Structure formats: C-alpha cells, structure tokens
Amino acid sequence: MSIRKIALVALIYMSFSISIIFSNKLVLTTFKFPSYLLLALIQTLFTFILIQTLCSYRIRSDDFTEVPIKILPLSIFSAVDIVMGIAGTGSLSLPLFTALRRISNVLIMVGEYLLLGTKRSIPIYLSVIVMVIGAVIAAIGDITFDPIGYTYILINNISTTGKALLTKSRLRDYDFSSIELIYFNSLLMLPILFILVYVQCDFTEIIQFEHWFDPLFLLYFIFSCCSAVALNYTLVQCTQYTSALTTSILGVIKNILVTYGGMFVGGDYVYTSLNFAGLTISTIGAVLYVVYNYKSTQYKCLPTKSRTLIG
C-alpha cells in the first residue's frame, strides 16, 4: 500500500475515533436520549450487518461450533465495555471522561505482565503514572462529582483491560483474522445486549422520546451508529497497514482534541483551575508515553553492539 493510502487510512481512523465520542455525547447529553443500552445495541448491530454484507467471504464458517467457546469471554467483556463507555460518555464531561479512561492503561500493563509476560521500560511506566496522577487531580477538582458516572468509568476501565488482553490472546492462540474476530465478537454480543435492553429499557419512554423526528438528532444518531462500524473497521485497517505505535500516536492526538475540544461540547464541563491542571498533566503523561514508547521501539531495532554503546 502506498504512503498516501496509509496516511488516508490513519486519518480516517482518527476522524471516526473522534466523531463517535462527540456524536455519542450529543445524542445522550444534548438531546438526552433515554437509553444508552439501546444505542450500544444498535451500534453493535450495525457493525455485524456491515461485516456480514461486505466481508462475509473473508470469514471461515466451517468450524463455527467451536467459536462460542473461544470468543464468548471476549464478547462479555466487549458488551460491558461498549455499554459502560457510552454510559460514561453521557454521565461525565468529555475532558474528565478522557482523563479517567487513561487509568485503564495501568490495568492493561499489569494484565500484560501477569498474563502475557510483557515488560516495558521504566520511563514508560513513569509516563503512565503521570497520566494517572493527572486524572486523579482532575477528579479532585471536579465540582460536578457524579458517583454513578465515576462507577461507569471504573467498570469501563476494567472491561477495557479484559477486552484488550482477551483480544490479544484470541488473535495469538486461535488464529482468527481481525475481521473474523470483530464479526464473531459482534455476533455473540448481540444476544447479551438484546437481553440487557429487554430487561432494563423503558420502551414507553423510548417510543415517546421527543426528538425522534428532529432531523438534527437523527443525523447525530445515525452518524453515531455508522461511526461505530467505521471505527471498528478502520482500526483493523490502521493496525494492519501501519503499526501499533502509529495507532498509539493517533490515539494520543485524538485524546488531546477530545480533552480540550470536549470542554465546548455537551455543555456539562465546569472549569476549575485544579481540574484543568489535572487534565493537562494527564495529557502531558500521554504524550510522554508515546515519546518513550517510540524510543523503546527504536532501541529494539538497533544492532546489539549499538545498544551497548547507548546509555
């Protein structure tokens, strides 16, 4: 693939990564859509239908009987992750949501070390600590403290960790392609989300929702669902045609834009100097993480003799 096409894939991935956060926020906070569970279900359904329509020829179906055993744990964590992620987006301001979500990096690193034996350099660990310290400071400075919203984010961080570790292990141990993993994961998530929607949703409130015929709401709602599909697909493409480091850098750029741009979206961000300082410290930690990760990658690529001369 040409450099121009690679750059285009990366740009599209980052664009949809940002757009789904903002569109979810507008749907849930500005228009006060009554069910984050239904939104999660529709996004997952869109993902499944699109892959079934466009990529079915790339999905193996000869050994489907073994798929649920292999994928179901991932699907459970993924269902919790998307539900809590959308719920957290609607409950907290985007800057605070983004900062608190960085705590999942610590959990993922601990999980990688314990389960996968992955070790990282001390500067990388320190940069993650800076991220978390910033998030804690931002939370202390949050005068709109919402215990339910914070609970959503806590569960979201745990589910993100489980999802990340299980995704790595399923790709490594069971020889699934990325498209197959997304497809089967979405398929097994659907009944879980259907049950949650049936049990928890107030269908009368959903039917009587006042903005169903508001063109602007419908635009954001449809865009939110389409962004979920596009995000899943472009994430796979970005990872395939670039590198994990490139994806990481794009994620940091996205979070910087969401952190500061999110102050003006949703109307629920309340400025305090302590909160703003915490958000900035957490963002600096995220930038340092990418820098040290890049240096670590470059160091590993050096010949052994060159490595011994450095440091």
Predicted regions and their residues:
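Polytopic endomembrane small-metabolite transporters, centered on the Drug/Metabolite Transporter
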Residues: 1-311
